[in-house]
């Protein structure tokens, strides 16, 4: 007989025909899947009773699904007369209906079910908790009490009903979330230009909300945009090709607009940008303190407020950085290569204090060649923060103690805390301290060596331990000899 099992809780969009699965398979306890639920077959009752394992708490009152014919009715239909152990009893059942009717009215089921839902479960006087198929019912009587399903609204709400009308499966995880309608994104794919991630996402190496206030707008991984946004150590590696450079070739100077443009209808009262100075190979681009050269994008539309004359930036204010440059269009901004800046004048900005190295030096890396300065930097690092002596330096990073400067083991540390005061002012690096079990001290220790106190009598009295060991060996040999008997 062809019959249909429907998941009663979610009025599932997926209907399975039992005749496809042979009866032998049913009795062998093979589980069927509906949407995302498993229907387990209970072999104790002759394979007749099938229950939803995750709704199990209420004695299967609502979840029990008969093997052969359909549970939930779609109107107060008179069903067949049901025979039970007590005798034949006929009742009008809202719960049973023939599978044909069910197959005819798939469209109604979501809406109707949701309407009748509350009323149905409120009336627990006759919950079909001994519901089994017409055949099986005689053999099987359940002992479980009749308890209404605990909180059915949680499982089947109006929203769920609407969702099922659109024939979307309601999965456990998506049940409460509103975003569940979006297509799931594939975690394995690379971050795309179109992706917008919140700035708290630390996996995104292009966005740092502290230093880059525009990060919320549009995000693009194209190298020249990144160049204008970040100070990247990697920056040389992703410079764009030489052909597209907007600065001057062979003394021909590029200026964004030759005459000041009066702008009658300006949309923004904001401070407008000045035009970039003409660039030639000889003069290096101005640099701010953060090593970002101040290059304005050279665009034809540059505006000058109030007819003020075109000119370079005033050198005094480098605080605001680039004036009118909107980060969105900064793809036109390019940086000169270091090789192009020209060695004719040593570029002061690139080198820092010592101009001797000319342009060979990479301006993005701090100049550590001066030993005095690097020593000072490391020393300051140690002086700046008092280090708590009882804590392992690397405890934040792993469970295991780090392989750092040899320092005391934990037990030693605890002991030596009481022995000597810790001083935070010494420079750990420069004190020669061969004994790893002590903390380095800010001064040379001048305590005289104390020789151990010797009481000559007590030393001679200590001897009898050796006799003990002799007796021990005798006993041991005696035991061993038994093995070889």
Swiss-Prot record:
The keyword Cell division does not apply. Keywords: Cell membrane, Membrane, Phosphoprotein. Residues 1-200 are annotated as: Sufficient for interaction with Skb1. Residues 451-485 are annotated as: Required and sufficient for plasma membrane anchoring. GO terms for cellular component: lateral cortical node; plasma membrane. The modification Phosphoserine is found at residues 222, 458. Its main location: membrane. The keyword tRNA processing does not apply. It is found in: Cell membrane. Residues 171-182, 218-230, 341-363, 394-416 have a biased composition (Polar residues). One of its GO terms (biological process) is protein localization to lateral cortical node. Residues 189-198, 371-393, 447-464 have a biased composition (Basic and acidic residues). It comes from the Eukaryota. Residues 117-230, 286-416, 446-466 are annotated as: Disordered. Acts as a membrane anchor for Skb1 in forming plasma membrane microdomains. Promotes mitotic entry by sequestering mitotic inhibitor Skb1 from its regulatory targets Cdr1 and Wee1. Interacts with Skb1. This is Skb1 localization factor 1.
């Amino acid at each position: 007989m062809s019959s249909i099992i429907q998941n009663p809780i979610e009025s599932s969009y997926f209907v399975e025909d039992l005749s496809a699965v042979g009866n032998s398979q049913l009795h062998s306890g093979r589980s069927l899947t509906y949407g995302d639920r498993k229907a387990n077959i209970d072999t104790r009752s002759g394979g007749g009773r099938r229950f939803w394992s995750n709704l199990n708490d209420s004695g299967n009152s609502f979840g029990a699904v008969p093997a052969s014919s359909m549970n939930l009715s779609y109107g107060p239909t008179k069903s067949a007369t049901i025979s039970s152990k007590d005798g034949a009893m006929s009742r009008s059942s809202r719960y049973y209906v023939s599978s044909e009717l069910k197959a005819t009215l798939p469209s109604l089921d979501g809406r109707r079910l949701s309407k009748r839902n509350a009323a149905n479960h409120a009336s627990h006087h006759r919950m079909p908790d001994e519901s089994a198929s017409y055949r099986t019912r005689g053999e099987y009587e359940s002992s479980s009490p009749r308890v209404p399903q605990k909180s059915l609204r949680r499982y089947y709400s109006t929203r769920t009903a609407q969702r099922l009308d659109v024939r979307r499966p309601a999965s456990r995880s998506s049940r409460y979330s509103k975003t569940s309608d979006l297509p799931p994104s594939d975690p394995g794919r690379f971050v795309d230009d179109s992706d917008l991630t919140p700035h708290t996402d630390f996996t995104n190496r292009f966005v740092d909300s502290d230093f880059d206030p525009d990060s919320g707008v549009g995000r693009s991984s194209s190298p020249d945009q990144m160049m204008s946004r970040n100070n990247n150590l990697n920056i040389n590696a992703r410079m764009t090709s030489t052909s597209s450079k907007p600065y001057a070739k062979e003394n021909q100077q590029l200026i964004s607009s030759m005459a000041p443009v009066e702008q009658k209808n300006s949309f923004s009262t904001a401070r407008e940008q000045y035009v970039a100075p003409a660039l030639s190979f000889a003069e290096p681009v101005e640099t701010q303190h953060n090593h970002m050269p101040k290059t304005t994008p050279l665009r034809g539309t540059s505006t000058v407020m109030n007819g003020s004359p075109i000119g370079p930036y005033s050198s005094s204010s480098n605080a605001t950085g680039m004036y009118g440059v909107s980060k969105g269009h900064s793809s036109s901004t390019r940086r000169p290569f270091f090789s192009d800046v020209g060695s004719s004048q040593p570029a002061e900005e690139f080198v820092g204090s010592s101009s001797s190295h000319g342009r060979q030096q990479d301006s993005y890396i701090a100049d550590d060649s001066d030993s005095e300065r690097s020593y000072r930097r490391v020393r300051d690092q140690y002086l700046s923060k008092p280090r708590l002596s009882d804590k392992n330096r690397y405890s934040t990073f792993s469970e295991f103690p780090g392989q750092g400067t040899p320092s005391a083991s934990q037990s030693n540390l605890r002991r030596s805390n009481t022995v000597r005061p810790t001083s935070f002012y010494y420079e750990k690096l420069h004190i020669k301290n061969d004994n790893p079990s002590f903390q380095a001290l800010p001064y040379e220790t001048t305590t005289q060596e104390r020789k151990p106190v010797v009481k000559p009598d007590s030393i001679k009295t200590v001897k009898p331990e050796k006799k003990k060991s002799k007796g021990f060996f005798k006993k041991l040999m005696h035991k061993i000899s038994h093995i070889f008997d």
